[in-house]
Structure formats: structure tokens, C-alpha cells
């Protein structure tokens, strides 16, 4: 199976996520919205509605790919492998992540701030209408660093150690967190369960990834010592138990400071500051972050394979 996952990564790097083709994540989102409406209308509490919605989405997201691969394997093992490759391909997003941040970079190179704000709004939830160039760069770097775990290394973790059905299960977990994991009036209770499950699912991959980011910064000639230092000093300051780790590692590697004031629907939100502002924000830091993300994705996958192979050998 490792070679199959490697092919999935290659397909993602070549094709990305074609917008005109059906995608499991969009189907998961539609299912989740329908179940949310049903259980909100038929449950005694928002917490129970959120738990039932989440568990049913998780179950369906696991069973469909699991049974599909089993059926394909019965027809021919090659069909099973091909289907597994395609399922895993849909759970990772290396190409899309790099492309989106590159679009922000291109707009900034053209000194087109309105376009850069529009492009960065596709990858962040904060208000972008009045962001300065430095704030756009910070938003782009923060989003890319955070999504390295959600969009790449965690689905690869479950693909390597569990297979395609587990990778899709994780994708459903992350999708529900994106839909419901907000601490506002509507989702504070309903979304608490999927948010906790997402934190749990990302816990180990986030920690592995953050240290591999330090290693990647060494190979790329960035400040790896500072990356390790900031990771250990600031990684746990973030409200999320996982997001701050990779953001801190990237901040240290690039010698910049992430976090600070953001606006969400006009409401000010202050995130802990990660890193020290040794350098001003520069457009090239977007490309440097992309290099870190790409190399870290490859090295993390190799690390997973080594652990999997070692465990298989001894067991």
C-alpha cells in the first residue's frame, strides 16, 4: 500500500482538486448540513444533536469507502488498489494549498492589494477587506502552516496506518470541525463534540509534523535552531492544541512573528503571538513557507512509512 499512497500524492501534485468534478468532501458537507437540520429539530439538546450528526457522518464516511474497496478487491486486486489510490488522493490537498498561497503571492508581486485580499479570503476566515500587505502575508503564512496538518500530514497518517477508509474518516472529522467547530451562539454546544474529535484526531500527527518542519528548515537553509526554540517556547500558546505547533515552527524558521489582532465579522480577536519579529514581513516568505510545506509533507510521509515498515517487520 505505501507505493499506492505515493501515487496518490503524485496525482494530487499533478491534478490538485479539479473544481468541476465531484468531490467526497462536498458530499460530506451536504450530508452534514442535512443531518444537522434533522437532529436539531428532533433532539432535546444541541449537544446531543451535534453528537448524533457527527457520529452518523463519521460512520457513513468510513463504511462507504471501506465496502467499496472490499468489493473492488473481490473483482480484482488491481481495481482495489486503484480505488484506494483515488480515495486517498481526495483526502489530501498539497497542490491546492500551494496554488492558493501562490495566487496571493502573484497578486502581491503585482502590487494589487485588492486582488491579494480577495485571494487570501479564500484560505482564511478572518475579514480581509482592509488588510495591509504585511497582514496579507501573515494571514497566508498562518493558514498554510496550520493547514499542513489538516490537509496533508494527518490524512496521510491515517492512510498509512489505517488505509483509505480511515483517511476518509479523518477527512469527515476535519470537515465537520470546519462546518461546526465555531465558538459562537449557533455552534458553541452543537459543535463542541466534532471540535474535540478533530483535536484528538490531529494530536499525534501535529506533533510529528511540527518537528519535521524543524528538520525541513535545516535542509532548506532556514533558521532551524530558532524554529525548534520557538516551537518549544510558543507552540502551546495557541487556543488550538495543534495549530500553534506548526505555526510556531514556521515562525521560528522564517524569523517572523505570527498571531496578533484579526477581525471576524467585524469583531476583534487577539491570537497569541508566536515567534519574534526579527524580520519584517516580505512577499518571498510566502514562497519560503510553500517550500517548507512541500518538503515537510514528503519527509512526514517517509517517516510514517519507516515507522509502519518497522512495526510490520517486528510484528
From Swiss-Prot:
Transmembrane spans: 48-70, 75-94, 148-170, 208-230, 292-314
Cystine bridges: none
Membrane association type: Multi-pass membrane protein
InterPro entries cross-referenced by the UniProt entry: Cobalamin_biosynth_CobD/CbiB
GO molecular function: ABC-type vitamin B12 transporter activity; threonine-phosphate decarboxylase activity
GO biological process: cobalamin biosynthetic process
Pathway: Cofactor biosynthesis; adenosylcobalamin biosynthesis
Keyword annotations of the record: Cell membrane, Cobalamin biosynthesis, Membrane, Transmembrane, Transmembrane helix
Cellular component annotations (GO), alphabetically ordered: plasma membrane
Location in the cell: Cell membrane
UniProt key word Membrane: yes
Primary role: Converts cobyric acid to cobinamide by the addition of aminopropanol on the F carboxylic group.
Protein family per UniProt: Belongs to the CobD/CbiB family.
Protein name per Swiss-Prot or TrEMBL: Cobalamin biosynthesis protein CobD
Organism, scientific name: Leptospira interrogans serogroup Icterohaemorrhagiae serovar Lai (strain 56601)
Amino acid at each position: 500500500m505505501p507505493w499506492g499512497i505515493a501515487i496518490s500524492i503524485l496525482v494530487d501534485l499533478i491534478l490538485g482538486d479539479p473544481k468541476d468534478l465531484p468531490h467526497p468532501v462536498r458530499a460530506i458537507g451536504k450530508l452534514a448540513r442535512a443531518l444537522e437540520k434533522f437532529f436539531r429539530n428532533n433532539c432535546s439538546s444541541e449537544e446531543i444533536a451535534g453528537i448524533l450528526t457527527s457520529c452518523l457522518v463519521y460512520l457513513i464516511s468510513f463504511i462507504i469507502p471501506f465496502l467499496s474497496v472490499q468489493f473492488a478487491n473481490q473483482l480484482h486486486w488491481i481495481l482495489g488498489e486503484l480505488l484506494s489510490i483515488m480515495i486517498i488522493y481526495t483526502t489530501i490537498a498539497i497542490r491546492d494549498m500551494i496554488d492558493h498561497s501562490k495566487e496571493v503571492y502573484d497578486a502581491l508581486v503585482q502590487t494589487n492589494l485588492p486582488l491579494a485580499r480577495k485571494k487570501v479570503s479564500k484560505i482564511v476566515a478572518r475579514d480581509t477587506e482592509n488588510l495591509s500587505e504585511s497582514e496579507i502575508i501573515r494571514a497566508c503564512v498562518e493558514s498554510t502552516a496550520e493547514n499542513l496538518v489538516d490537509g496533508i500530514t494527518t490524512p496521510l497518517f491515517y492512510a498509512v496506518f489505517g488505509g483509505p477508509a480511515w483517511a476518509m474518516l479523518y477527512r469527515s472529522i476535519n470537515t465537520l470541525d470546519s462546518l461546526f467547530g465555531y465558538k459562537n451562539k449557533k455552534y458553541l454546544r452543537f459543535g463542541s463534540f466534532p471540535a474535540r474529535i478533530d483535536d484528538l484526531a490531529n494530536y499525534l500527527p501535529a506533533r510529528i509534523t511540527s518537528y519535521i518542519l524543524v528538520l525541513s528548515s535545516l535542509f532548506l537553509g532556514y533558521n532551524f535552531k530558532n524554529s525548534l526554540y520557538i516551537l518549544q517556547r510558543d507552540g502551546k500558546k495557541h487556543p488550538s492544541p495543534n495549530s500553534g505547533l506548526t505555526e510556531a515552527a514556521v515562525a521560528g524558521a522564517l524569523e517572523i512573528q505570527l498571531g496578533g489582532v484579526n477581525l471576524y465579522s467585524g469583531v476583534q480577536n487577539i491570537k497569541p503571538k508566536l515567534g519574534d519579529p526579527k524580520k519584517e514581513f516580505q512577499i518571498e516568505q510566502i514562497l519560503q513557507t510553500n517550500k517548507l510545506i512541500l518538503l515537510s509533507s514528503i519527509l512526514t510521509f517517509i517517516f510514517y512509512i519507516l515507522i509502519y515498515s518497522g512495526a510490520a517487520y517486528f510484528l
